[in-house]
């Protein structure tokens, strides 16, 4: 199964493509989509949408996992990131790729085994689990890989619950 993990943002969208074969995880590609700060938000959203369409076409993931929004301070930032998240999810929907969402706590739990893990711990475990030489930069990229790992870990439970619903 191929998973596209996404850490949404307006300035930087981290992405990580991971293949899961049995219990093995293999990184395929990872990086970021970056938009220029001075550009109007609609143009930045268009750039993110088009880049997402390209990623989805190039890597053809079976499923996509996205981090749920969690902001407790800056409401303006939350709205803008929410807009970016919307075009990201729309691109996946148009490509016929199912989207799964995870909270930051779920990511911490899946990657490190501890829901209160620090960012550095998550990044180091991501590096270890994917057998990378170093932690990917910027942080958004490492976060996206962590989100893909989270979906790989939760996938077995999703399959069981989907079977129950049928």
From Swiss-Prot:
One of its GO terms (molecular function) is crossover junction DNA endonuclease activity. GO terms for cellular component: cytoplasm; Holliday junction resolvase complex. Mg(2+) 2 binds at residue 67. GO terms for biological process: DNA recombination; DNA repair. It is an enzyme of class 3 (hydrolase). The keyword Cytoplasm applies. InterPro entries: RNaseH-like_sf, RNaseH_sf, X-over_junc_endoDNase_Mg_BS, X-over_junc_endoDNase_RuvC. Mg(2+) 1 binds at residues 7, 140. It is found in: Cytoplasm. Its cofactor is Mg(2+). The active site is at residues 7, 67, 140. Binds 2 Mg(2+) ion per subunit. Its EC number is 3.1.21.10. Keywords: Cytoplasm, DNA damage, DNA recombination, DNA repair, DNA-binding, Endonuclease, Hydrolase, Magnesium, Metal-binding, Nuclease. It catalyses: Endonucleolytic cleavage at a junction such as a reciprocal single-stranded crossover between two homologous DNA duplexes (Holliday junction). SUPFAM superfamilies: Ribonuclease H-like. Pfam families: RuvC. PANTHER family: CROSSOVER JUNCTION ENDODEOXYRIBONUCLEASE RUVC. The RuvA-RuvB-RuvC complex processes Holliday junction (HJ) DNA during genetic recombination and DNA repair. Endonuclease that resolves HJ intermediates. Cleaves cruciform DNA by making single-stranded nicks across the HJ at symmetrical positions within the homologous arms, yielding a 5'-phosphate and a 3'-hydroxyl group; requires a central core of homology in the junction. The consensus cleavage sequence is 5'-(A/T)TT(C/G)-3'. Cleavage occurs on the 3'-side of the TT dinucleotide at the point of strand exchange. Belongs to the RuvC family. Homodimer which binds Holliday junction (HJ) DNA. The HJ becomes 2-fold symmetrical on binding to RuvC with unstacked arms; it has a different conformation from HJ DNA in complex with RuvA. In the full resolvosome a probable DNA-RuvA(4)-RuvB(12)-RuvC(2) complex forms which resolves the HJ. This is Crossover junction endodeoxyribonuclease RuvC. It comes from Brevibacillus brevis (strain 47 / JCM 6285 / NBRC 100599). The lineage of its organism: Bacteria, Bacillati, Bacillota, Bacilli, Bacillales.
């Amino acid at each position: 199964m191929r998973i596209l993990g996404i850490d949404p943002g307006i300035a930087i969208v981290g992405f990580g493509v991971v293949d899961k074969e049995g219990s093995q995880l293999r990184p395929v590609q990872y990086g970021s989509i970056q938009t220029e700060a001075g550009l109007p938000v609609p143009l930045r959203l268009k750039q993110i949408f088009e880049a997402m369409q390209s990623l989805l076409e190039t890597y053809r993931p079976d499923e996509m996992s996205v981090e749920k929004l969690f902001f407790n301070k800056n409401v303006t930032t939350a709205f803008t990131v929410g807009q970016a998240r919307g075009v990201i999810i729309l691109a996946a929907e148009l490509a016929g790729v199912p989207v799964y969402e995870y909270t930051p706590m779920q990511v911490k739990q899946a990657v490190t085994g501890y829901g209160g893990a620090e960012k550095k711990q998550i990044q180091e475990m991501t590096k270890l689990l994917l057998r990378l030489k170093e932690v990917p930069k910027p942080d958004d990229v490492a976060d996206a890989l962590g989100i893909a790992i989270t979906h790989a870990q939760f996938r077995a439970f999703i399959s069981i619950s989907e079977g129950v619903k049928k």
